[in-house]
């Protein structure tokens, strides 16, 4: 399956991008049309971008001449079945990891073999063994996968409820549902790294400290302005970030308000506007953008669906000082138009070899490229 890259849809998106507001000196353009585009992974040579979805496809966006514009978009490994293959990540050596709803696979040298229909796939976590099959859900099963400074895999496992019920907590703590798990890259030595997560769909390691930072989507139905969304900083293994005792930030959930939370709950580094849906994120490690952006976090707010006054649909930037204090502000906005309708919903962020930034949008079915061109 090939996706046409020109026509009315591309023209329409280019018109929308004229309304996106960013700091002076930045430009945004359409990089590729990619249906349902979610998490992204740039291959080490920079000639192919792999894009996950919440459907049944992984897409490959190729730029063979490396001119910064997509040449072709096709489905990856069409002979294989994928089930919510949201999470994609490359190792430095070119191994592609794909985290599905209940399966994790590795594809050696995917950058060089994606042209053919048949590719080598290695089970890292066999199908049905990432979570108990009885816990499979469409809700909160979009995984992200990362490789840590320790060379291990880190995989988010959202819990499927609005608020996790008490009778599930023991199972979830054992399996890492409502948390982040880590394992060796062959799938061995699995352990729970993070507890007390509701549904995280964005994570990255600080390029200097190696600490894991991650976003979390918080409880619905408590009101327009509570609880806040979260950007979290994890300083050691085993920390608990408060779900289900806390709905977001320090706001207690109705279901657990009479229950004493565990000791040592870690509260977020940044509380974000309620229901804006903070999803994918990445640290900026390139040299193209002005110096103040070095090692800052760029993150995508997907936009609300259950708020009287819609919010989100923008790219945020978070500056972190030497003590780990974080300050977040809007960087690119305008996908929520003046009629309060969504013209797009940014979902995830990744960086290109030249220091440009790519932003995926599963609502528009597009990937945008943001670069700094100077004043």
Locate each region found by the language model.
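Short loop/turn segments immediately following the C-termini of beta-strands
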Residues: 45, 53-54, 101-103, 109, ...
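Blade-loop segments of beta-propeller domains
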Residues: 38, 60-94
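Conserved beta-strand position repeated across blades of beta-propeller domains
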Residues: 32, 41-43, 89, 146, ...
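Asp-box/WD-like beta-propeller blade repeats and closely related beta-sheet repeat scaffolds
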Residues: 73, 83-86, 101-148
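Beta-propeller domain segments
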Residues: 1-23, 142, 159-167, 175-191, ...
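Surface loop/turn motifs at the tips and blade-to-blade linkers of beta-strand repeat domains
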Residues: 30-35, 76-81, 124-137, 192-196, ...
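Beta-propeller domains
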Residues: 44, 48-70, 110-112
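Conserved beta-propeller blade signature
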Residues: 48-52, 95-98, 152-156, 211-215, ...
């Amino acid at each position: 399956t090939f996706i046409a890259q020109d026509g009315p849809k591309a023209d329409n998106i280019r018109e929308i991008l004229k309304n996106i507001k960013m700091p002076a000196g930045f430009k945004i353009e359409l990089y590729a049309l990619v249906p349902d585009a979610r998490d992204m992974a740039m291959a080490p040579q920079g000639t192919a971008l792999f894009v996950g979805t919440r459907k049944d496809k992984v897409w490959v966006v190729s730029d063979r001449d490396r001119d910064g514009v997509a040449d072709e978009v096709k489905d990856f490994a069409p002979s294989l079945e994928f089930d919510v293959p949201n999470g994609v990540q490359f190792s430095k050596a070119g191994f592609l990891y794909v985290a599905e709803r209940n399966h994790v696979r590795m594809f050696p040298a995917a950058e060089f073999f994606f042209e053919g229909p048949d590719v080598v796939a290695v089970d890292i976590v066999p199908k049905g063994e990432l979570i108990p099959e009885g816990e499979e859900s469409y809700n909160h099963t979009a995984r992200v996968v990362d490789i840590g400074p320790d060379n291990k895999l880190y995989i988010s496992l959202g819990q499927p409820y609005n608020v996790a019920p008490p009778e599930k907590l023991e199972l979830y703590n054992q399996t890492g549902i409502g948390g982040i798990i880590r394992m060796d890259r062959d799938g061995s030595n699995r352990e729970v790294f993070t507890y007390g997560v509701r549904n995280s769909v964005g994570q990255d390691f600080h390029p200097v400290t190696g600490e894991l930072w991650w976003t979390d989507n918080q409880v619905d139905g408590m009101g327009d302005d509570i609880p806040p969304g979260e950007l979290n900083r994890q300083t050691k293994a085993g920390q608990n970030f408060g779900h289900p005792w806390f709905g977001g930030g320090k706001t207690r959930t109705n279901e657990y308000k009479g229950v004493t939370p565990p000791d040592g709950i870690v509260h977020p580094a940044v509380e974000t506007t309620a229901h804006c849906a903070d999803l994918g994120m990445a640290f900026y490690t390139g040299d193209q953008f002005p110096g103040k952006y070095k090692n800052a976090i760029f993150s995508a707010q997907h936009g609300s669906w259950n708020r009287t006054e819609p919010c989100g649909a923008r790219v945020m930037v978070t500056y972190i000082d030497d003590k780990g204090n974080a300050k977040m502000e809007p960087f690119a906005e305008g996908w929520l138009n003046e009629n309060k309708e969504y013209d797009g919903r940014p979902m995830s962020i990744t960086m290109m070899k030249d220091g440009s930034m790519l932003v995926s949008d599963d609502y528009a079915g597009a990937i945008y490229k943001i670069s700094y061109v100077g004043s």
